[in-house]
UniProtKB/Swiss-Prot annotation:
Sequence-specific endonuclease that cleaves unmethylated GATC sequences. It is involved in DNA mismatch repair. Pfam families: MutH (PF02976). Keywords: Cytoplasm, DNA damage, DNA repair, Endonuclease, Hydrolase, Nuclease. This is DNA mismatch repair protein MutH. One of its GO terms (cellular component) is cytoplasm. It comes from Haemophilus influenzae (strain PittEE).
Length: 223
């Protein structure tokens, strides 16, 4: 069922909280892979199916009619994020005039339904649990941090300084090669303004940033 309101979406998300991947997959008649080595997107697909996500294209939000993006957040036993969170691919060409206000990153992060999930590898995939959903919109300070990082990184892209981009740049968001291997090639702008072959780059939220979102939710949650 495709949720028609935010309340319906949250209700559906709350109804699967506490289930294991195996329980939910059996309910939806979806086979469970032995692990995620060859099926990295399986958990996201499982939750999209369970919640009725509509986006056929990754350029849109998962629940575009509600203005909501769905993000899974693998956490360890202490409740800390295990990995960075992919947001969107960076526009390496045809990016002149692009501003934070109309960027894909801002669009994707304007309203997020976070689904924390058990991510520790010693737990068999079928036995990992789904956590309580978190509806999140960036605070003014978080938006400032995201905008600052985005502008700094986009400046390097637009000026043809791709070779100067490292994962260390950015307070809460970083740029990293996106792709299962280094054979994925796309077009970018070189230092002299020429079109060059380069690796696709993706914007990723740092673990410290998503940990802050988790902690804020836990602090406001009634006991």
């Amino acid at each position: 069922m495709i949720p028609q309101t935010l309340e319906q979406l949250l209700s559906q998300a709350q109804s699967i909280a506490g289930l294991t991947f195996g329980e939910l997959a059996d309910e939806l008649h979806i086979p469970v892979p032995p692990d995620l080595k060859r099926d990295k997107g399986w958990v996201g697909m499982l939750l999209e199916r369970a919640l009725g996500a509509t986006a056929g294209s990754k350029a849109e939000q998962d629940f575009s009619h509600l203005g909501v993006e769905l993000k899974t957040l693998p956490i360890n036993a202490e409740g800390y994020p295990l990995e960075t969170t992919f947001v969107s691919l960076a526009p390496l060409v045809q990016n002149s005039g692009v501003k934070w206000e109309n960027s894909h990153v801002r669009h994707k992060l304007s309203c997020v339904l976070w689904m924390p999930i058990e991510g520790s590898r010693h737990i068999p995939l079928r036995e990992r649990h789904i956590g309580a959903p978190i509806f999140w919109k960036p605070t003014a300070e978080q938006e400032r941090q995201l905008k600052q990082d985005w502008e700094e990184l986009m400046d390097l892209i637009v000026l043809g300084k791709l070779d100067q981009i490292t994962a260390r740049i950015g307070e809460v968001m970083q740029l990293r090669p996106k792709g299962a291997n280094s054979k994925a090639i796309t077009k970018g702008i070189g230092k002299n303004g020429e079109v060059i072959d380069t690796l696709p780059l993706g914007f990723y939220l740092r673990k410290e940033f998503t940990a802050q979102i988790l902690n804020a939710f836990l602090e406001t949650k009634p006991l």
